[in-house]
Amino acid sequence: MGMIIRTPKRIHLGLIDPTGSLGRRFGSLGVALEGGYEVKVLPAERLEVKAEGEDVETIKKAVERMNSAFGTGTGYLIEVRKAIPRHVGLGSTTQLSLAVGTAIARLNNLNVSIEKLAEVLGRGKNSGAGIYAFAYGGFVLDGGVKEGIPPLILHEEFPGEWAFLLVIPEVKPGLDEEEEKPIMSGNFGDVNVAMEISHRILLGLLPALKERNVRAFGEHLSAIQRLVGRHFAEFQGGEFREDVELILDWLGKKTYGAGQSSWGPTVYGLILKAEFQRLSAELNDHLKEHGIRAKVELGLPRNTGAEVVSENAFLERLIRSVGGS
C-alpha cells in the first residue's frame, strides 16, 4: 500500500535579524497557501522516480538521507503528480523533501517529529517558515537559528477571506541553495533594522492578524518587506529585485500590502479573496501595457498542514467526490 502526500506551498514574509545580535540568527515568518506538491510513494524493489527537472535529485537525496538516518532502505516508487515551480520563491525544495521523508516514515511506522525530520533532510538551516507551513499550515513565525532547527514561536490561522495576488514574472530565477550559501553564512544586516522589523511584527502585524484587520496587516507587511529588503539590498541591487519593481509598485498601490517572497521572482499583494477577479484583470492589463510576461495566480491561504493518506483512502475519497459508490 502506498501513500499520497499533498503539501502546501509557502510565501515568505521575511527574515528578521541576519546579524544574530542576540545569539539567534534570522527568524522568519510565512504563510501556507493551497497548490503545493502531490506526491505518491509506494514500496518497490528499487528506487524509481517519476518527476521532472531538479525534483528528481531532491527526491533521491531525501531517500538517501532517510535511509542513512533510519535504515528505511531505498526501494520506493516515487511519483510527483503536481509540483511547485522551482526557484521562484515558493519553497519547493523543502515541501518536496518533507513530503518524501514523511511518506517514508509512515510506510516504515516511524514516529518522527517534524523538527527531527527537517534536520535529517537538511532543511531549516536559515528559516523554519517552510517546515512549519508543511506541518501546520496558516501563518507561522519561528524564533531564529541557534543550534538545530529554529523553534516555532507562533502558529495562527490565516483569515479565509484574505488571499494573495501572486505574480511570477518570466525573469531570472531566484537564487538556489548553493548560490545563497555564501551569503547566508556571511555577516550582513543591520541590527537597527532588525529591531524595527521586530517592533512592527510584535505591535503591528500580529495584533492586526488577531483582530482580522486586513488594512493594518497589509500596512505593516509592506513596511516589514521594505525593511527586510534593506538587509539584502547589497545582494539583490536594492530593497527588491530590480526586475520586479514595476510590478511591486502596482501591487503597493492597488493591494493592502505587497512584498517579494524569498529571493523571488514571485511577488505578492494582500487582497480580499472577492477582489481577485477585478484586480487580476487590471494587473494583466498593466503587465501587457509594459510588455511584462508573468503568471498571475490567486494565492489561497491553507490553514492545515500537509495531507497524508493511504492510497486506498485517497481513491475512496476521489470516488465519493465524483458521486461514485
Regions found by a protein language model. Give the residues of each.
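Glycine/small-residue-rich loop that forms an oxyanion/phosphate-binding "nest" at active or ligand-binding sites
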Residues: 85, 99, 121-124
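ATP-binding N-lobe of GHMP and related small-molecule kinases
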Residues: 1-88, 105-114, 302-305, 309-325
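A structural signal for short secondary-structure junctions
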Residues: 32-33, 72, 252, 259-263
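ATP-dependent small-molecule kinase catalytic core of the GHMP/sugar-kinase superfamily
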Residues: 2-6, 12-14, 20-28, 113-254, ...
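Short glycine/threonine-rich catalytic loop with a Thr-x-Gly-x-Asp
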Residues: 89-92, 96, 194, 257-263
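Short, flexible, solvent-exposed loop/turn segments with mixed acidic/basic and small polar residues
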Residues: 38-41, 255-260
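DPxDG-like acidic metal-binding loop motif
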Residues: 90-114, 133-144
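Short Gly/Ser/Thr- and Asp/Glu-enriched loop/turn motifs at secondary-structure junctions
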Residues: 8, 135, 260-265
